[in-house]
Amino acid sequence: MAAPSLRTARLLLPFALLAAWLAVGGFLGPFAGRLGEVSTNDQAAFLPRSAESTRVLTEQRAFRQRETLPVIVVWTADGGGSVRRQQAAATTALASLTRTPGVAGRTSPALPAEDGRALQGVVPLRPDLGGRLPAALDRIRAAADRVPGTTAQLAGPAATQGDLGDAFAGIDGLLLGVALAAVLVILLLVYRSVLLPFLVILSAVFALGLACALVYALADHGTVRVDGQVQGILSILVIGAATDYALLFSARYREELTRHADRFTAARAALRRSWGPITASAATVALGLLALLLSDLTNNRSLGPVGALGIGCALLSSLTFLPAALVLLGRSAYWPTRPRATDGTDSAHGLWQRVAGVVDRSPRTVWASCLVALLACAAFAPTLASRGVPLSETFVDDAPSVTAQDTLDRHFPGGSGNPAVVIADAARLPRVLAAARHTEGVASAAAVSASGRPGAEPLVAGGRARADVTLRSAADSDDARDTIARLRSSVRAVPGAHAVVGGYTAQRYDTLRTAERDRTLIVPVVLAVILVILAGLLRSLLMPVLLVATVAVNFLATLGVSALVFRHVFGFSGTDPSVPLYGFVFLVALGVDYNIFLMSRVREESLRHGVRQGVARGLVSTGGVITAAGVVLAATFAALGVIPLAFLAQIAFIVAFGVLLDTLVVRSLLVPALVRDIGRLAWWPGRLSRRPDVREVPRTPRTADEVR
């Protein structure tokens, strides 16, 4: 029994840490609900910095007083007939908006479709409206609804941005609530402890509050950029990672309580043996996310530092707040059970003992069967189309802007309202227009005039002139992107024109090309970072290669299954170009996490008992807690599905399914069987590869999973 003065001294640090985190939660916790104040859902964030379409955006500023965000108003007759009689009223409604707050400049007249069954007009809005955009859209909708005998709808970039804002509305409370509820239910079912799940969740909430406060400060000063997508991923990432790290530490502490009567000694032993794998895991995820800084897409670059900061906060909370809380509570934290050194084993231990026995007896059969199954799934990975999705598939539900765009496409040329923008030297503009009109897939091409009237003198700025080119295909279609490629070739062929092509479709085309380039660059960097971290942790060169290879196979298998599910279950024709990259970064980094936890324990046991027994002991010791952590992480990412955006729903499925596949198959069967079959050589050139194996009768290891 420690002396009272010594016990008091040992309580000071845990109490100080607990007080510090309670202060963090009290003062910084509200920032988790305030990130929306500094976030923006401007679609310009998805544009490549160095792309031709981005250059066009820059040049366009010379042709007008300010940037605009257009709203396309489309009218159809209530009875489905002609709307030509309402054209004057529609033009009047548009003109009445000119001096409305948020409108940037003159509105267009209402123009009829060739079939006479629809009208369209454009209202230019200021691009910096932010939270005032919904009110501006409401005013436009109210004016458009005053045209008698018609139904008015709003399409175009501003309407889409408004629907994106609606999709992310309430993201703070809803997403966090769903994620935490899922975590709590799983922890209560798995650990059958009343207090521990709440401590784990409190640790995750404190980490999220600290991360959001730091990100808020950085975003408020313009250092990082935050949108609803980054905000949602940050919440899920921090909750999932903090829960995982907390589970791994609490499991190791519980195990040490079965070895040490003194809770302080048990806490020191748990920290000493768990901080290395947990820190390596956090470093893997953080550095993998920071690799996104190499991306040319603003949104990807924003997620990198924001996500890495969140992982750092999760690590800090899990290795400071949780140990302090657990050491103060001692064995009471696991109530109604109280782990003691005399405790025995239970059925959960028996399950992993049986799994380890199968792996030990038939390792080659186990890993070969797993590998064949994974490769069979991976065979479908090339069928996952990541060339972007049409606007109709951007939202999981039918958004008003999507319905309006469908109406527009039925009555006007596919690219109407979203023309390609061509900027060229003014002296060569007639030849550029001729080249554009002769390009396959182009419906019309006209110079932009100062008066806005067709056929008037072209507007010239700095010796450059602008033309709008309407495409025959829908602006978000594959055919339209192919037309952009042909259009660029055509106008570049005009000598001395120095023509560049931008606009909505060109931006999508450039984003696709940039996403392909990003994958080619970032994937090898992430793999290299993981290999270096694993080599340093495991003191081996062959083992890191083996682990990364298994995680890569798991990723490809996940993509294969996702391709089938997206097309045949969810009805998605494809994915956003960034989905495979995000899936890779999250799944590979998080997948390596579980291999780090497993193999660091296998190495620890192998140094004591030999490689063969080390594999079995490591699997039995970590099986329950890693499986629980994987289920929790999968459920946390699945919570992204509550946001009605296809992009996040696809990320949610890929990561959730991939984590479960990795946890239940790769980490539980494939990796242990491979290491068992390869033997000491798997640890080459570390000292384990040179040590003779110890042959002894396995005794039942004592772990956190044994005591319930």
PLM regions: where:
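Short, contiguous strand/loop micro-motifs
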Residues: 43-44, 80-81, 299-302, 342-343, ...
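Structured non-transmembrane domains adjacent to transmembrane bundles in polytopic membrane proteins
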Residues: 49-70, 78-161, 383-574, 596
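A general boundary/transition motif marking the beginning of the first structured unit of a protein
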Residues: 48, 313, 343-347, 396, ...
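Membrane-embedded transmembrane helical bundles of large multi-pass transporters/channels
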Residues: 1-38, 103, 127-386, 505-708
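Short, solvent-exposed beta-strand/turn patches at coil↔beta or beta↔helix junctions
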Residues: 40-48
